């Protein structure tokens, strides 16, 4: 998983003054313009469906590592895919957000909307975010049709995640140096019924990738290798 300044931003070591005030008034007089190229047409051309793969779990559970490995496997098969990473989006799209509950909610709201655009563009989009709250994940799921959102719980015990933390972020959180750190000073709500539970704390990366790829094939999102 990423460490250093980017990882600290993902998990709460963030300037508490970040986040400028925004207007709460919604835009008016806007109309949705439908594309002349449909999602179905893109799927037909590319030979695979689009989907949102939502990787969630504690910091250090292996979300980004697994998402990027699955992304590579999809790419090697010639499939359209892209990773939205929790650290990366805070460099741009969400660099005005901190780690309060409200900011976390807004962070996931934005990612859900971006993922929906990728879905319409015919891409298998892999999102790797702690996304600690069930309600926020449920809102992201509700943006799309049933079957388009695949929640993948990267399950790893807290002690395993701490052992993987070479930069000592968990230790700093326990010492009170990092505020709102998920799993220590901020809660993580495990998925109650994820489409897929991957034991990233126990099995190898290769096994985890194989589990995800097999699930996508079973659901008819991607073709078996050699049939694309």
Predicted regions and their residues:
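The conserved Walker
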Residues: 59
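Conserved beta-strand scaffold positions in the cores of enzyme catalytic domains, especially
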Residues: 83, 149-151, 195-197
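ATP-dependent NMP and nucleoside kinases share a basic, alpha-helical "lid"
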Residues: 92-99, 113-174, 180
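Conserved substrate/cofactor phosphate-moiety recognition/catalytic segment
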Residues: 68-116, 120
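Extreme N-terminal, non-catalytic leader segments
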Residues: 2-4, 8-52
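Conserved lysine of the Walker
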Residues: 63
């Amino acid at each position: 998983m990423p460490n250093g300044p980017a990882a600290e931003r993902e998990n709460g070591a963030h300037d508490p003054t970040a986040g400028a005030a925004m207007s709460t008034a919604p835009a008016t007089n806007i109309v949705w313009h439908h594309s002349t190229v449909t999602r179905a047409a893109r799927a037909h051309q590319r030979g695979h469906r689009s989907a949102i793969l939502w990787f969630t779990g504690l910091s250090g559970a292996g979300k980004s590592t697994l998402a990027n490995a699955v992304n590579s496997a999809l790419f090697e098969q010639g499939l359209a895919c892209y990773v939205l990473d929790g650290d990366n989006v805070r460099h741009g799209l969400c660099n005005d957000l901190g780690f309060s509950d409200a900011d976390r909610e807004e962070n996931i709201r934005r990612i859900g909307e971006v993922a929906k655009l990728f879905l319409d563009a015919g891409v298998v989009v892999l999102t790797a975010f702690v996304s600690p709250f069930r309600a926020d994940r449920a809102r992201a799921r509700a943006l799309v049709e049933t079957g388009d959102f695949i929640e993948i719980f990267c399950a790893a015990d807290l002690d395993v995640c701490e052992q993987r933390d070479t930069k000592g972020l968990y230790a700093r959180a326990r010492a009170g140096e990092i505020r709102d750190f998920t799993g220590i000073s901020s809660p993580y709500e495990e998925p109650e019924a994820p489409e897929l539970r991957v034991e990233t704390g126990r099995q190898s990366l290769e096994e985890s990738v194989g589990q995800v790829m097999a699930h996508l094939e079973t659901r008819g999102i991607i073709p078996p290798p050699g049939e694309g």
